[in-house]
UniProtKB/Swiss-Prot annotation:
The keyword Secreted is assigned to this record: yes
Keyword Disulfide bond belongs to the record: yes
Major location (coarse): secreted
Lineage: Eukaryota, Metazoa, Ecdysozoa, Arthropoda, Myriapoda
MF terms in GO: toxin activity
GO CC terms, sorted: extracellular region
Signal sequence extent: 1-26
Protein name: U-scoloptoxin(16)-Er8a
Keyword terms of this UniProt record: Disulfide bond, Secreted, Signal, Toxin
Length: 111
């Protein structure tokens, strides 16, 4: 494994471990509340989403849901991939696609 690849894997592991603190089987979080825009979420991607509507961020492998906040606001609830412990001898695969199909997984030689 090249030193660049080792550094990339090390950075990924640090990110994954820090994400593990959130929730071990994937995580949900509410992100910044937005002002009410006709009862819809405005994620600044050019689209408005009704409360209960889901959309996807394929680049970061997230599922985002527009939820009702408090005091006349809406919020974006984000679902992300579970975090895996490091498996020596295995390769971490990033399959791409839309959540949850884009979630990384380990491919081990003897499994």
């Amino acid at each position: 494994m090249t030193s660049t690849r080792k550094l990339s894997v090390s950075c990924l592991i640090v990110f994954m471990v820090s994400s593990l603190i959130a929730v071990s089987s994937g995580w949900l979080s509410s992100t910044g509340k937005s002002p009410l825009k006709i009862g819809k979420c405005d994620p600044k991607n050019g689209n408005l989403y009704a409360i209960g509507r889901k959309w996807y961020n394929d680049e970061d492998c997230f599922e985002i849901t527009c939820i009702q906040g408090d005091k006349g606001s809406v919020a974006q609830q984000v679902a992300s991939c579970p975090v895996h412990a490091v498996k020596p001898g295995c390769e971490l695969v990033f399959p791409g696609g839309t959540y949850p199909k884009c979630c990384p997984y380990y491919e081990c030689p003897n499994s």
